């Protein structure tokens, strides 16, 4: 009888722990290319890692405050970094990003389109047991959308974005 009671107690504790698991989500959009920016009065993104470094610094802050085992998922717009690497920087930017993942032990998820970001938010983890504690975006934006590849493939524009009208597709109960 005592063993059965202990078993129920252990199962109950594990169930409670599973219900309160939290995930921090960081998103890094991509850098622009100099070939588009060089004609502007105020070009930006001279360094490829602006949005990568910002996320890395935040990862360090979260781990310092919440502990090294904290669940952190980092979504990165891969096409932008592949394009920047091949057309401008001539170095393996993907390996640099992966090295951040490896050093800090975070879950790195590559994405190409806003739909993939929404899909991860809604179903990337079992959302009945893993709730999103915090969500942060590092990248280009305007008042209506996040532009994951702004001035990366086309000048002053984006082919990959998440518009405010699409936010309704994010399930409310994931937070």
What are these regions (language model features)?
Residues 4-12:
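Sec-dependent N-terminal signal peptides
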Residues 14-19:
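Sec/Tat signal peptide C-region and signal peptidase I cleavage site
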Residues 26-28:
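A beta-strand/beta-hairpin structural motif
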Residues 30-31, 36, 44, 61-175:
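Catalytic-core segments of thiol-dependent peptidases
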Residues 46-61:
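Short catalytic helix/loop segments, enriched in acidic residues and glycine
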């Amino acid at each position: 009888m005592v063993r059965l009671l202990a078993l129920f107690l252990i199962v109950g504790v594990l169930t409670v722990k599973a219900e309160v698991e939290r995930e921090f989500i960081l998103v890094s959009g991509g850098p622009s290319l100099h070939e588009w920016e060089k004609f502007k009065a105020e070009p930006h993104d001279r360094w490829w890692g602006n949005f990568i470094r910002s996320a890395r610094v935040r990862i360090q802050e979260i781990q310092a405050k919440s502990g090294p085992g904290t669940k952190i998922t980092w979504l990165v717009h891969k096409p932008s970094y592949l394009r920047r690497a091949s057309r401008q920087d001539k170095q393996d930017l993907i390996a640099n990003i992966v090295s951040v993942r490896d050093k800090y032990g975070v879950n790195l998820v590559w994405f190409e389109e806003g739909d993939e970001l929404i899909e991860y938010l809604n179903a990337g983890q079992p959302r009945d047991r893993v709730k999103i504690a915090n969500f942060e975006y590092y990248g280009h934006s305007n008042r209506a959308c996040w532009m994951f590849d702004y001035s990366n493939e086309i000048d002053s524009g984006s082919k990959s974005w998440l518009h405010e009208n699409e936010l309704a597709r994010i399930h409310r109960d994931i937070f």
